[in-house]
Amino acid sequence: SPFHKGFAELGEVLKTPISQIMGEDVVMFKEKVNFKMPGGDGFTPHQDQQAGWGYYTDYFLSALVCIDETTIENGCLQIVAGHQHDGLYKEWEPLTEENMADMEFVHCPTKPGDMVIFDCYTPHSSDLNMRDKTRRLYYATYNRASAGDHLEQYYADKYKNYPPDIDREKGKEYVFRV
């Protein structure tokens, strides 16, 4: 992260376990902090690869690093084991009831400093935050270095297609589909 020294350092530290899992050097694809405010909505079941990431390369690993404790009550991550081997269900669409018929979403509560690593084909979701306190999670996503460095292009594309509220054209509808 060019904007925050601590996140830049963490992003570098996370490269080691991600590289070990990938079996080669990695580069950061994207990073974010998810803030889930009290009453804040969850995320419908999806695979990260459904959001058009295949335009850049075919495989990513994401590291979730817990900042604030996550619980079932404040909308912790829920993942499905084993279905990442099914590959991409459908690009630009969330998972359907038919896709999820034999999936069991498992809650993954975390404490500050805990890390969860999952790939771009792992079905996952979260529920709304029913607590009276905001909770935060840091996500860093990496791809193989041999597949290229796409970080700048990803953020340029995201800004162009889904700009922050302050930069949106009046009257234009922006829909993030996954």
Predicted features and spans:
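Short, surface-exposed recognition loops or helix-turn segments adjacent to catalytic cores
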Residues: 29-37, 77-80
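Double-stranded beta-helix
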Residues: 70-125, 147, 160-166
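Signature of the catalytic double-stranded beta-helix
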Residues: 1-32, 55-56
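A structural signal for short, well-ordered beta-strand segments
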Residues: 31-33, 63-65, 138-142
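Non-catalytic surface loops within mature trypsin-like serine protease
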Residues: 37, 67-69, 142-144
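Non-heme Fe(II)/2-oxoglutarate
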Residues: 122-123, 127-178
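Acidic, His- and aromatic-enriched active-site or binding-groove loops in soluble protein domains
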Residues: 47-64
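Conserved short histidine dyad/triad with adjacent acidic residue
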Residues: 35-51, 70-72, 120-121, 125
